Amino acid sequence: MFKRQKYSETIFFPKKIKQRGVVYRDKFKKIVKVIAEFDKFKKIFFVTDYGPKAAVIININGKILLSRQYRLLLNNISYEIPAGSINKNEKPNKAAIRECLEETGYFCKKLKLLIEYDPDLECSKNHTYIFHTSYASKIKNFNRDKYAWVTIKNCLKMIKEGKIKDSLTIISILSKKHLN
């Protein structure tokens, strides 16, 4: 049996938070300078607001649908579940359906919320909804190189080997495996 440890924790809350305005804005994000004043110091944050994001993990006959996309920081192809920004006045599940169709040519339906989370709690706003379903049909003729159906076992192997690097995809696969 484990003994519960007593922690002497000091948590610093800022006395004042000042938003200094938008330092950058484009179609996909805005960056705001924020100054947090504590008792003995100040801390400057540059908070990037990407807006909310929706994703869908499709599992049909034990295989997961992954899109294949070039990613600059990898300078390579990344295997990812279909995901993207939620447009203004768009519901998260509708955004996930749209993104899946845009990225893979598959139309999915009967989505259920698997998990929602915030990937960063300090410098990035990007509330994320991950849905799951077993219902999808191909309605757009896409190049087969744009997507892949991969078994859950092989997805887990790809994560362990560093072949799947996208955090949203890793969270989605592990959540599907362990929470559902």
Predicted regions: what is each one?
Residues K18-A55, I60:
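Acidic, metal-coordinating catalytic segment for phosphate/diphosphate chemistry
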